[in-house]
């Protein structure tokens, strides 16, 4: 595929910035079998980008993905995915570093094995591993975490399953620079109950809720727990119109500061509309909001306190509270045209607003930039 874009307001700590971005992404995909039955798929893609006004060309980005499914047509089913990526790009949100290109490796693996113990019940085990490692010298914590779940389902009807599951996981934190403090291994425990399946002729999805505990055994007072949720439903308003709603609530550790817990709440709503009767035109639109509540954490450090009656700040060394609330609002919309199976054209717009509110006035608008970003992307995709 070939992608060209225009982006404004990328870095609010500097004057308004706009740039023309070009991306060429060759790739290849191999598949054995059909996704409706048993299959194995391998994909590779290389993204080559250029920021023309900034005169910056990030290192070529490489993406590999493997996905598969096996069903013995009796009682056993297995499915899983794995992706490995080398990415070199600017980063936004609560890991944004302003005008800095950041190289990083990521690995993400998910798998599930299900055994039908009867016509109405099944047992399953699932697992995941998430890994991210930033280049040396970046003041962000990477992590290497895995989680395993054991669950069971019961079908009161042919289309609906009620489930209960419990899980346990570990997260090791990776320091990209010695300036970052050491964080011991974090343990996470949780349990969910819920329902999934085809609720009506038009409504399907998963609705689950439970409780999650993130524990730092070697750090007194650093453990915390929250009610957790995982909701994902879709509604087919018409054959040509589909709405999707998702909400998740989960725990994590802050990427910038050792021992600081964070709770993320993410909500998204998307709509997909096929235009006309030929199926070659499609429009999409979406809105999402992610809030991050970072726990109170006091430490001795630098603060830039406002000077009353002026716009100036004074540097002081004192006890500061790193408690903060972040929010990310994203809007998107686009239209695509697919005159052939091997040819697709697209025009897309995206808006992103990131804001941060520190409890301590000496930290506000200093360490993390807030920003608005507008992106207009035009692309063509060629291939089978």
What are these regions (language model features)?
Residues 1-384:
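Gram-negative and organellar
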